């Protein structure tokens, strides 16, 4: 698959830098490449020069009157064109040093962005920053009735599970699993545990080691389990090979009817672990259906949680303070009064600090 390589080079010059001098000084570099020039001039807004090559590559040179100079180049992502672009950028950078006469305040050359490649390496963080992962292979890519399921291989993080474009868990992310289980502070031996979601098998694998009485995991998507038991074995071990074990069972069902059924039956758990979804980024809880789903899960979970039990869940990126505050407000609106604590954890593949919550019912007077 042919991909496009987008390279950038930025200069911040002193306010007295002359745009016309810079434009004329750089023209010869592009002309040497056989590129066709087109220049647009605005009296108060500087210059825009476009250079087009016969091989389909092109460059935009934008010179602002306050000293900002931006160069954007697009080319095919091939070795030959990549070397040509690097050479061109080097020449522009050297020429700019000559033209600016030491008035350059800042030079910024970012790694090129490859667009439209066979492997997508770019995934935004929860707070909207762009991250390029060191993905070198698509391990698994299938559409289930519920979502797109990708497992991609990272040189640093191992295989990464990505659900509908959202980075879920990598083989490196034991820190996530430990945090959503209480960070090693809980005694699971002889306890009844309910896991909501968790199709990667990480939580189930770790809890089974702690000799619980019974773990019930409710996962709606069989295809997530199928992909993870084959390609995420460093995370799940062999617990997903069978849907039933000595101390666990996996139900392939929607968790909401299951929670309602358990609540009606009066069934209770020592621990409920919600691994379904992060706190929504939206700050309109009355309008966003994800918030409605989250509130429903919270209320139903409290109904099946023992009075002295604990509810664990992920929050979101530590920078999303407004969304996290809204989540904490929702905790105050449940059918029963609760208290909570939170912990900030570094999950390797997330490349951002992540908040985890522990919720418990207030003691009865």
Swiss-Prot record:
S-adenosyl 3-(methylsulfanyl)propylamine binds at residues 147, 219, 254-255. PROSITE patterns: PABS_1 (PS01330), PABS_2 (PS51006). CDD domains: AdoMet_MTases (cd02440). It holds the Pfam family Spermine_synt_N. InterPro entries: PABS (IPR030374), PABS_CS (IPR030373), SAM-dependent_MTases_sf (IPR029063), Spermidine_synt_N (IPR035246), Spermidine_synt_N_sf (IPR037163), Spermine_synthase_animal (IPR015576), SpmSyn_N (IPR040900). GO terms for biological process: spermine biosynthetic process. Pathway: Amine and polyamine biosynthesis; spermine biosynthesis; spermine from spermidine: step 1/1. Composed of 3 domains: the N-terminal domain has structural similarity to S-adenosylmethionine decarboxylase, the central domain is made up of four beta strands and the C-terminal domain is similar in structure to spermidine synthase. The N- and C-terminal domains are both required for activity. Catalyzes the production of spermine from spermidine and decarboxylated S-adenosylmethionine (dcSAM). This is Spermine synthase. It comes from Bos taurus (Bovine).
